[in-house]
Amino acid sequence: MAVFCASSARLALPTLLRNIYRSEFASELHSSRPVSLRQVSYSHNRFNNGRSFASLSRLLASQSGSHMNPQPSSQPIITESSSEQLDAAEDGSIVGAPTKDAAVNRDRRDPDKPTRKTKKAKFASSQTEPDATSAKSSRDKKHVRSDRASPDYKPKKKKEPWQIQKDALKKKFKEGWNPSKKLSPDALEGIRHLHAVAPDKFTTPVLAEQFQVSPEAIRRILKSKWRPSETEMEDRRKRWEKRHDRIWSHLSELGLRPKTKRTEALDDSNILYGKGEEGNKPSE
């Protein structure tokens, strides 16, 4: 007949599970401080595995020892140690939790207040901006110096007074202040003479239409008081005679003017066939 053993019945699996859960609930009820559900669930999930393994390891050790020396007081010791371990763990979690809650509450209180890191970053960026501008200006100065040191660099010369006046005339008269048609010295004297004899009849627009020049050119001719000397007049006369002969020979080649002995030496055919000034025929 089988004999019932009280110590072995106490170490059975249902009894062990019942004692473990009873010790856990007793330790949770033992804590006197009010803890939020969030903190309890966090601490329970954090320390649940550690407590269960520690209690089971100790129970297995006590079970092996009970077979050798059965002591009825071993089970209460295990439950007390597990309850003390749970209390210490929960106290530690409760003590450490307010620091995290305080930080969260601080952030909720001042959501718009910048942190120290953002302040330091802004201060560093404000210091780097003037440094970048100064570095850029120094680079530009070095670039200008290198351009000046290059052999192709030419410094800008100061304009002469006549250059400044010429630029001003170009801006004022975009088509050009010089007349497109050159007038001979005889034509210039004729314009001055006609305007002096009958200024009401030979006005500036009438003279400009008659000589086919701009009114500004007629106005400058009448306003000018410069008169050439005798030698200058002779040189100008010779130049205009040559110019006249050159134009006449060109028109005669085109068939617009008759050929003359005076303009025959200026024909382009003399250059083509190698005729000299004496009019020698080319050698065959």
Swiss-Prot record:
GO cellular component, one term: mitochondrion
Protein location: Mitochondrion
Ranges of compositional bias, category Basic and acidic residues: 103-115, 275-284
Interval spanned by the transit peptide: 1-53
Region (Disordered): 62-184, 258-284
Keyword terms, alphabetized: Mitochondrion, Transit peptide
Primary localisation category: mitochondrion
Pfam families reported in the protein's UniProt record: Neugrin
Compositionally biased region (Polar residues): 67-85, 124-136
InterPro entries: NGRN/Rrg9
Family: Belongs to the RRG9 family.
Role noted for this protein: Required for respiratory activity and maintenance and expression of the mitochondrial genome.
Protein name: Required for respiratory growth protein 9, mitochondrial
